[in-house]
Amino acid sequence: MELNDANLQTLTEFLRKTLDPDPTVRRPAEKFLESVEGNQNYPLLLLTLLEKSQDNVIRVCAAVTFKNYIKRNWRIVEDEPNKISDPDRTAVKANIVNLMLSSPEQIQKQLSDAISIIGREDFPQKWPDLLTEMVARFRSGDFHIINGVLRTAHSLFKRYRHEFKSNELWSEIKLVLDTFALPLTELFKATIELCQTHATDVNALKVLFSSLTLIAKLFYSLNFQDLPEFFEDNMETWMTNFHGLLTLDNKLLQTDDEEEAGLLELLKSQICDNAALYAQKYDEEFQPYLPRFVTAIWNLLVSTGQEVKYDLLVSNAIQFLASVCERPHYKHLFEDQNTLTSICEKVIVPNMEFRSADEEAFEDNSEEYIRRDLEGSDIDTRRRAACDLVRGLCKFFEGPVTAIFSGYVNSMLSEYAKNPRENWKHKDAAIYLVTSLASKAQTQKHGITQANELVNLTEFFVNHILPDLKSPNVNEFPVLKADAIKYVMIFRSQLPKEQLLQAVPLLITHLQAESTVEHTYAAHALERLFTMRGPNNATLITAAEMAPFTEQLLNNLFKALAFPGSAENEYIMKAIMRSFSLLQESIVPYIPTLIGQLTHKLLQVSKNPSKPHFNHYLFESLCLSVRITCKANPTTVSSFEEALFPVFTEILQNDVQEFLPYVFQVMSLLLEIHSNSIPASYMALFPHLLQPVLWERTGNIPPLVRLLQAYLEKGGETIARSAADKIPGLLGVFQKLIASKANDHQGFYLLNSIIEHMPPESLTQYRKQIFILLFQRLQSSKTTKFIKSFLVFVNLYCVKYGAIALQEIFDSIQPKMFGMVLEKIVIPEVQKVSGPVEKKICAVGITKVLTECPAMMDTEYTKLWTPLLQALIGLFELPEDDSIPDDEHFIDIEDTPGYQTAFSQLAFAGKKEHDPIGDAVGNPKILLAQSLHKLSTACPGRVPSMLSTSLNAEALQFLQGYLQAATVQLV
């Protein structure tokens, strides 16, 4: 694509169409942009547009498109073509910093993100001048430019907060500190001075305080891994100024907005974080500054209002106290009973109150409320911080703290009892306090795993939780009902089973509550209870115990999906999945009705997939319906196909990328249930599964391979007979997969199925080429994973076609190649093979080579006979060799910044491990003994003499054991 006006005009038109709300206009435009993004100059055209377009909407759209393009394509993935040409990469890096700094803020943010994505891959090795170019801009004096640099540096360095320690990381941070720490400190001091100079200029202060907040964030990132020497030497400068900013109160920066945090709050919040970091990690060095920070933060807490805009500040300030009170160093600051009472009264109790803003969120923004309350994204909430402070104080002062709080809990509950309708918030706070007091350790999987023994959880449940759950009107006091459900959920591991069983029917009833939070919590609580393990590793609650409630449970769960706002509620769908899994065959009578509801739901969500978790659990539930019903009666598979295929066809035709991996897995499950034949409906689809475009998406590969394996297993003969022209396409897929280090094992899965299930004559013309391709890959990049898969394939080929055929095909490629493969690959590497089925295949294959291949007994290959036998005995007896060569590159596809739909494995579409040898060989050691016996009777004297001259004593001893077990001997 040339950099010319015509192309800029075309790009402008298509970008405008991507903003169209009409999908018939928007989708073709998105497809067009996708089709041209591989062309050279495409990123430069976007950068030109965002710089020069007259239309601001197009500029912003170009910036967002550019950022997403970089996110998808910048990383160079091994084995895949470079998606951005080298000249484009160089040009982007040469221009982007300048462009970002001269752009308006809306565009600056997008380009700043793009720089950090590029930096994640290229900095520092491939972009060594990035930092010096950025630091040079500090001298510009223009705070629009300076803030652009700071914002970019923040997005570049914030990963230091969660990276694992490594030499590479240390050297990168050292480089950053050497270049950046001093200019940042100078900028910090200069900005503080400018704040004093412009103390009465509100516009200047807004810009300067934005800078200070970014500087404080950078301080946190650069100090997170370890205390750098530079910052230790300059601690006085940083801490004195941080303390000054913490105690600053500039009326000009106060906002009237009750919701949105202002610049002053954001800066103070970050300073609290920085102080907490130093108090936790560098307490010795920070000790001289700690008392004044404790005083400043305490004063801040007791003087800050209850408005939402202060939430982040208050929660960070409380988190600071929580991190301080947990350290033995600072224990003395909290020992006094009056101090504990004061903290409880002035900090903890006020911040546990359920405010009108919380009530609003509960009713009108339930999704966000649930996300915060259930999923632990409540890190920045006052309640969560107050809860953490209670836990921190209990570490050293459990007795006194429990006594103080028990008094508060009792008085709150008695206030509630006087007038429940008016005072229900008192009970809410009491439940929250009890929860914080009682929780010592918690996990997602088990809820509270360690509780404060001074709190009687069962008594509290019976007296204060059960009455709310039993109340006949599920829509009355929804917040207290949600609290009660949550109590059951988080203390499930602490409450006795009989109380959990008492709660189950009550929770089922609460699925009918109109409140989204309430019916979501009920679904989540049931799902968690159904996963609890009892004795013997079985589920704690059994299908038999659920029998009286099964119908109501299923009805209420599906009805709950009809509530406004819960049409794609992931908690309800997960509870449906878990109920199916627990109830097993008890659900069969209901499936004819439920499958219709599930497929209807699938059709709806496939129009615009937006809730990945919901969609995943929906497909899991479909798999369970199929597995459970067909286990009882395999012929019902056709009724599932009738229900599902119309929806699947629509998903395939509309190329709903997110759903294709799921559809392929469910189809595999259905096809695997058929007895040995392929229905015509599947054969019609077969050619489409070989289309290269499907195989370009990483997420499709594992499920597509499994689906093709199912085709081969059920209809290798049919494919050879009626679709022989598709065999080259099938082998083309194998060829593509084998060339990739990330997917070569999938190529072998496919190849092994082809060898196992296709009639031998249908492959005659292709066999030699298959081996040549494998050797080419061995020469170009030999990884441990590839060799293990190669060994399994070679031995499977031997089992299927015989040892002579294996030797002949190797030697037809190149004379004496069979010996080279044995000597260089099989003998030294076979011990790396892992997995019982894989080891069995190798053992049977090698046994055949040893005992059924004449060339091993009377040619130059004979010298390899004993080493090969020794290697086989090693495979049986030695521990698996899991060593990996030092220089081997690990393919990391987990954190690709621009990943395609990752493969989502459906747990309930699980495939049984297939053993191609099956019962034909029970014990490979016995097979070896019997085969050696047979060989020795055919050529008497040869085998014992080869063993006695060159097999080591330990291996010989093991072999004697096999012969005895098989009751045979060598002659």
From Swiss-Prot:
Gene of this entry: cse1l
Species classification: Eukaryota, Metazoa, Chordata, Craniata, Vertebrata
Coiled coil location: none
Protein location: Cytoplasm; Nucleus
Pfam families for the chain: CAS_CSE1, Cse1, IBN_N
Cited Gene3D superfamilies: Leucine-rich Repeat Variant
Family: Belongs to the XPO2/CSE1 family.
Subunit comment: Interacts with cftr.
Record's function text: Export receptor for importin alpha. Mediates importin-alpha re-export from the nucleus to the cytoplasm after import substrates have been released into the nucleoplasm. Negatively regulates fluid secretion and plays a role in fluid homeostasis by down-regulating cftr activity.
Protein name as catalogued: Exportin-2
Gene Ontology biological process terms in this record: protein export from nucleus; protein import into nucleus
